[in-house]
């Protein structure tokens, strides 16, 4: 639907989400990163701006859903579990299924390859899938996911969040690269 995302916090990851939306085909979006960097918030805002129907599961908060996903012996049973716990009708071509805290059910990551091949729904997975936790995934379906790693705010994002304009950011970065002091009042504003 290409709506403008109305988020309070401008993040560079949004550009990567939009690129996935524009070209994803048979690929899920897998958003990873440390805890508390804004993954869930940013994904949720993006999806609600882009899709008519958003189904969201939190595998930490929803133990019954996690148990159902864990009990699924194949992709058909996993999809039936998704459908049963969705809480609303799944509309092919208009629904995105967002599975948050996916590190709690590694089989969902492995099964995503088969879910996206069905081509009826879009899938977004999110979680703190760092190093050790990824080792528990039997097979990361590399060709079937677009991985976006999120990090804490970088300098530019921090400036955006504090209302600093792009021209001021560019000048500040130029001063840094040229190893010259930032104009006094601007320096004070940035502090």
Give the residues covered by each predicted segment.
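Phosphate-binding site recognition
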Residues: 1-191
């Amino acid at each position: 639907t290409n709506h403008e995302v109305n988020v309070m916090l401008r993040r560079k990851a949004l550009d990567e989400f939009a690129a996935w939306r524009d070209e994803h085909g048979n690929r899920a979006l897998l958003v990873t990163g440390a805890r508390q960097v804004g993954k869930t918030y940013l994904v949720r805002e993006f999806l609600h701006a882009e899709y008519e129907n958003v189904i969201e599961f939190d595998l930490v908060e929803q133990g019954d859903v996690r148990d159902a996903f864990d009990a699924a012996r194949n992709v058909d049973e996993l999809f039936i579990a998704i459908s049963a716990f969705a809480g609303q009708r799944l509309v092919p071509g208009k629904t995105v299924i967002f599975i948050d805290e996916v590190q709690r059910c590694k089989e969902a990551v492995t099964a995503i390859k088969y879910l996206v091949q069905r081509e009826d729904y879009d899938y977004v997975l999110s979680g703190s899938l760092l190093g050790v936790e990824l080792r528990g995934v039997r097979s990361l379906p590399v060709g079937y996911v677009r991985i976006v790693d999120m990090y804490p705010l970088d300098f530019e994002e921090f400036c955006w969040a504090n209302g600093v304009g792009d021209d001021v950011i560019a000048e500040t970065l130029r001063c840094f690269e040229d190893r010259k002091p930032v104009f006094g009042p601007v320096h004070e504003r940035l502090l």
